[in-house]
Amino acid sequence: MSGISPTELQNLDEPSKKEIMGFLETENSKQKVQMSIHQFTNLCFKNCIHSVQSADLSAQENQCLKDCVNRFLDTNIRIVKGLQSIQ
């Protein structure tokens, strides 16, 4: 993959700069979502799955995972709302 030098970036016209910045912001947002998914997957799996007995989840494991993910999402929503109210 080739990179773009800072000099080449400075030579771009304003619409191109805005397009690149928009692309970078979108990619950054995607990365944050992916990191959150990995984080709660890891956390919830460790909390809810203690041994693998079969290819299917037990009813208890299934409910535990649902509750765990919901708690994780609710917590993140509260944090975001709290941060937004501070700004």
UniProtKB/Swiss-Prot annotation:
InterPro entries hit by this protein: Tim10-like, Tim10-like_dom_sf
Compartments in which it is found: Mitochondrion inner membrane
UniProt membrane topology term: Peripheral membrane protein
A GO molecular-function descriptor: metal ion binding
Domain of life: Eukaryota
Signal peptide per UniProt: none
Paired cysteines (S-S): C44-C68, C48-C64
Record has Ubl conjugation as a keyword: no
Keyword flag Lipoprotein: no
GO-annotated cellular components: mitochondrial inner membrane; mitochondrial intermembrane space protein transporter complex
GO BP, sorted A to Z: protein insertion into mitochondrial inner membrane
SUPFAM superfamilies: Tim10-like
Short motif (Twin CX3C motif): ranges: 44-68
UniProtKB keywords: Chaperone, Disulfide bond, Membrane, Metal-binding, Mitochondrion, Mitochondrion inner membrane, Protein transport, Translocation, Transport, Zinc
Similarity field: Belongs to the small Tim family.
Complex and partners: Heterohexamer; composed of 3 copies of TIM8 and 3 copies of TIM13, named soluble 70 kDa complex. Associates with the TIM22 complex, whose core is composed of TIM22 and TIM54. Interacts with the transmembrane regions of multi-pass transmembrane proteins in transit.
Functional summary from the UniProt entry: Mitochondrial intermembrane chaperone that participates in the import and insertion of some multi-pass transmembrane proteins into the mitochondrial inner membrane. Also required for the transfer of beta-barrel precursors from the TOM complex to the sorting and assembly machinery (SAM complex) of the outer membrane. Acts as a chaperone-like protein that protects the hydrophobic precursors from aggregation and guide them through the mitochondrial intermembrane space.
UniProt comment concerning the protein's domains: The twin CX3C motif contains 4 conserved Cys residues that form 2 disulfide bonds in the mitochondrial intermembrane space. However, during the transit of TIM8 from cytoplasm into mitochondrion, the Cys residues probably coordinate zinc, thereby preventing folding and allowing its transfer across mitochondrial outer membrane.
UniProt protein name: Mitochondrial import inner membrane translocase subunit TIM8
Biological source species: Eremothecium gossypii (strain ATCC 10895 / CBS 109.51 / FGSC 9923 / NRRL Y-1056)
